[in-house]
Amino acid sequence: MRPPPALALAGLCLLALPAAAASYFGLTGREVLTPFPGLGTAAAPAQGGAHLKQCDLLKLSRRQKQLCRREPGLAETLRDAAHLGLLECQFQFRHERWNCSLEGRMGLLKRGFKETAFLYAVSSAALTHTLARACSAGRMERCTCDDSPGLESRQAWQWGVCGDNLKYSTKFLSNFLGSKRGNKDLRARADAHNTHVGIKAVKSGLRTTCKCHGVSGSCAVRTCWKQLSPFRETGQVLKLRYDSAVKVSSATNEALGRLELWAPARQGSLTKGLAPRSGDLVYMEDSPSFCRPSKYSPGTAGRVCSREASCSSLCCGRGYDTQSRLVAFSCHCQVQWCCYVECQQCVQEELVYTCKH
């Protein structure tokens, strides 16, 4: 059954980015982490030939590489975004059968699983977050602090701290993130939708922070700035979206003459189906179990688990081995006069549980 045209469009107007935008970068790119020899995360942005060389080292599309070469400081930001997305993905899925292992990632990207949806969302979210922070930190040449507070009673507020520039970040992403496909097939639209979910999750975490100034804390003047929430909070939001992801198919919007995402009604539901909401992660195929090694994951054999919380599910019914090990930790700590804490080293026995093969 075809949905009404207006219904099929619900929730698809997102952040004014192109409908076909998709995150072919980070965990959804050809290569996740490209090391820059001799460059630490706190290094100053490279200039000139060094910047161009760093752009060439990244596995980007031709258009993305051109944008990178025109933006001094962008190469380091892209690298940091890839790291951030990977670390957050692995943290959020550390107790799951699929733990965001790089092994099998390319196989996942060829399918429409829930895990694929999360990779697109966390990659676009990490890039949005990192780019906004890079602007406020002065690491990008073409952008600076957010300078459009949009608050009431501006006369009473003095903007003095450099805010995270989410406006520039989302505008830049509209050019940087592009689809390898057209927007005519279901997979392309699903990738675009999940990319937007990641961007929207970052945007929802933007907060206005103020500090009062004045005699006796009268707050006659306030210094305010816009600040993104920690990326861990964004990761938690996206993990919740993953847990409640919506399976979709396609339907033709007769008014616009194009395919739209469509979530069929669940069995026993009184509704005929709806378009997914703008914050829903969407997928097209049921995921494999991830229990055994496959082209999608290395399986769960040898994974450390919690006997009370995760061994039953993580080990897929194969059981688990128990090993004892000695762990050193600081104990009997005392504050010594003035300036330091003195501790003893203690050792305790710890049981470690690992999934059987």
Swiss-Prot record:
Q: How is it modified after translation?
A: Palmitoleoylation is required for efficient binding to frizzled receptors. Depalmitoleoylation leads to Wnt signaling pathway inhibition.
According to its UniProt entry, one GO biological process term is: regulation of tube size
Q: Which InterPro entries match?
A: Wnt, Wnt_C, Wnt_CS
Q: What is its main location?
A: secreted
This protein's GO CC annotations: extracellular region; extracellular space
Do the record's keywords include Signal?
yes
Q: Which family does it belong to?
A: Belongs to the Wnt family.
- What is the protein's given name? Protein Wnt-9b
User: Origin organism of this chain?
Assistant: Homo sapiens
Q: Which gene encodes it?
A: WNT9B
